[in-house]
Amino acid sequence: MTEFRDALGNITQINDKLERIVSLSPSVTETLFEYGLGKKIVGVSAFCKRPAETDNIRKVGSYGTARIEVLDEIKPDIVMMMSGYAEPLYKKIRERYNTFLFKLPTTVFGILELIKEVGIVTSSQDKARELEYAMLQGLKKVRKYSMKGYLEIDLGGPVTFGSQSYITDSLTLFGLTLPFEMRQHEWMVPNDQEIVEFDPDILIYEGKMYRGSNKEEVQKAFTDRGYGNSSFMRNKNIFVTPGKLDFFAHHGPSFFREVIPWLRNTLDSVSL
């Protein structure tokens, strides 16, 4: 049994060998599988979709809710969660179960720190070091581009990001200038007029999870919102993230394997 201090400063005692893990964070779940701990996971959130094997694991809740009766049934050794939106739920679950809260990353290197911390908490330090090295190799794909960009995600409505988000950090690492990169927020509802005045060269759009989107839908939606004369519309620099799962909105190991290469290839294709 080892003591760990979590994102809120609470001390949690965790078995050195975990047998029954519940993860309510998609990023933590993906990382646990990377460490060969998939068979130890007895419960996940409805949004834990990476890897595909998660489909066969009992669904315990979502980002901000959990079925306590299911937790009572499966009796986890540990419940793993992410700080931020889920903190009220964390406090509720912690009253009944051993619970550990990881810090929501605010930078690309914060994602690496999360991956490493999951390894430390689960006594998988050796595998964590190997994965950390592999993820660092992905950052070799980063190069600088000189252009103005805007990224928006449908999270039940349009959402964009400020300086406290790893998403903003990833885009500015590639040299993009963003309309809200200096705002002291993690996320915000976008102000269309401000963005029109900023006049981005490119638009990166991520559709709602499980639904996705396509370029034609996005072009129509942004035309209706008053972006018809924006540079990204005139030059047809509208890029929709692939698939129907969270892409930029997911901060697990696949961020380095999928998002970083996609972003570089996308920026390489931009014609201004």
Regions found by a protein language model. Give the residues of each.
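A ligand-binding cleft/hinge motif common to bilobed small-molecule-binding domains
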Residues: 87-93, 207-221
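Proline-aspartate-enriched helix->loop->beta-strand connector
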Residues: 65-84, 98, 191-209
